[in-house]
């Protein structure tokens, strides 16, 4: 850059700082690039698929899938992991369907969990914005976007047409709260439902509710599906679950993780660690027997997972070994993610 351009740039930067305050414009090289802090999902495989060891703080995340696929269970697992780190969490229950007893079984400290059951979509999003701006909340879950019903629709007649109201509400709210979420370093998770588009001949007819705004503003989008049943004899005790990272602004997307959700217990982490340990050479498998560090830990996956549950120190060591091996490339990705600007999107006029 020649001297005239340097002087012009210095003058412009000086004027910007006087008008908007120090730090309004900064050089990326003046400060060390820090890794994006993440909150574990409670699933080791999903943490690895996300590339940074969990869901990114200071960002919006969307989790969507069919009914009974594990959406709420996954978000409650995130809250449980965050609370273990001393985080303060809130649950905006627009569906009015949160079960405190089930949340407690998944490890959530329900006594410390902030819960809101708003009457309208505007109220839910306003409460979310106020919680974010308090700078005191680390994780907020909104369950769900489909239940964020605009006030005009609630007060109207049952058969009235309200085209695009929910989409406009989401677009306006996300424009308002995105910057606040980044400043507060708060993770906001929106749970969403699936609808079918009519008349689609090619491609998937599936879409999510609430318009297109959330798709743009979300840094991470997770598609969660139930792929089968976990059985003990003839009794169904859980679900085989697959989560695909459909969008990821902080690491490479389109990775996926498969794990089990056990009814009344949540994500089967110890079973995941056995599978990943065998896959990456930390756990040896010979026939039906599993061994770790040369010592047999159990016959069959269930007994080996029980050994890890009974020996948390060994489980923590194995988990750290797996994370250290599979998340070594994450810092470069995280640094690159910090350079991404937040995109402004056009308001979605229709709910598609």
Swiss-Prot record:
PANTHER family (UniProt xref): MITOCHONDRIAL DNA REPAIR PROTEIN RECA HOMOLOG-RELATED, RECA
This protein's record includes keyword ATP-binding: yes
Membership in a protein family: Belongs to the RecA family.
Pfam families: RecA, RecA_C
The protein, known as: Protein RecA
Physiological role: Can catalyze the hydrolysis of ATP in the presence of single-stranded DNA, the ATP-dependent uptake of single-stranded DNA by duplex DNA, and the ATP-dependent hybridization of homologous single-stranded DNAs. It interacts with LexA causing its activation and leading to its autocatalytic cleavage.
Swiss-Prot/TrEMBL keywords: ATP-binding, Cytoplasm, DNA damage, DNA recombination, DNA repair, DNA-binding, Nucleotide-binding, SOS response
Compartments in which it is found: Cytoplasm
GO biological process entries: DNA recombination; DNA repair; SOS response
Domain of life per record: Bacteria
Binding-site list for ATP: 65-72
GO cellular component: cytosol
NCBIfam families in alphabetical order: tigrfam_recA
A GO molecular-function descriptor: damaged DNA binding
Keyword Cytoplasm annotated: yes
Organism: Pseudomonas fluorescens (strain SBW25)
């Amino acid at each position: 850059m020649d001297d005239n351009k340097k002087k012009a740039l210095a003058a412009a930067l000086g004027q910007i700082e006087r008008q908007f305050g120090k730090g309004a414009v900064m050089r990326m090289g003046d400060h060390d690039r820090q890794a994006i802090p993440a909150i574990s999902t409670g699933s080791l495989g999903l943490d690895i698929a996300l590339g940074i060891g969990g869901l990114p703080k200071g960002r919006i995340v969307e989790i969507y899938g069919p009914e009974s696929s594990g959406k709420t269970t996954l978000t409650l697992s995130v809250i449980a992991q965050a609370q273990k780190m001393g985080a303060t969490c809130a649950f905006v229950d627009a569906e009015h369907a949160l079960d405190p007893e089930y949340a407690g079984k998944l490890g959530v400290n329900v006594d410390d969990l902030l819960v809101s059951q708003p009457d309208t979509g505007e109220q839910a999003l306003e409460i979310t914005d106020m919680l974010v701006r308090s700078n005191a909340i680390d994780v907020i879950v909104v369950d769900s976007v489909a239940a964020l019903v605009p006030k005009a629709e609630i007060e109207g007649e049952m058969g009235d047409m309200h085209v695009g109201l929910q989409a406009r509400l989401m677009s306006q709210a996300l424009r308002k709260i995105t910057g606040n979420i980044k400043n507060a370093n708060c993770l906001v998770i929106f749970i969403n439902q699936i609808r079918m588009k009519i008349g689609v001949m090619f491609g998937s007819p599936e879409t999510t509710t609430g318009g297109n705004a959330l798709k743009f503003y979300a840094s991470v989008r997770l598609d969660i599906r139930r792929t089968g049943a976990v059985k003990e004899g003839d009794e169904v005790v859980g679900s085989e679950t697959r989560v695909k990272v459909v969008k990821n602004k902080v690491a490479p997307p389109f990775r996926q993780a498969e794990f089990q959700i056990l009814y009344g217990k949540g994500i089967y982490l110890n079973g995941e660690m056995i599978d990943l340990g065998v896959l990456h050479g930390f756990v040896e498998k010979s026939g039906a027997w599993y061994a770790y560090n040369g010592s047999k830990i159990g016959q069959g996956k269930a007994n080996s997972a029980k050994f890890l549950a009974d020996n948390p120190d060994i489980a923590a060591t194995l988990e750290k070994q797996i994370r250290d091996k599979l998340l070594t490339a994450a810092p470069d990705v995280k640094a690159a993610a910090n350079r991404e600007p937040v995109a402004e999107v056009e308001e979605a006029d229709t709910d598609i």
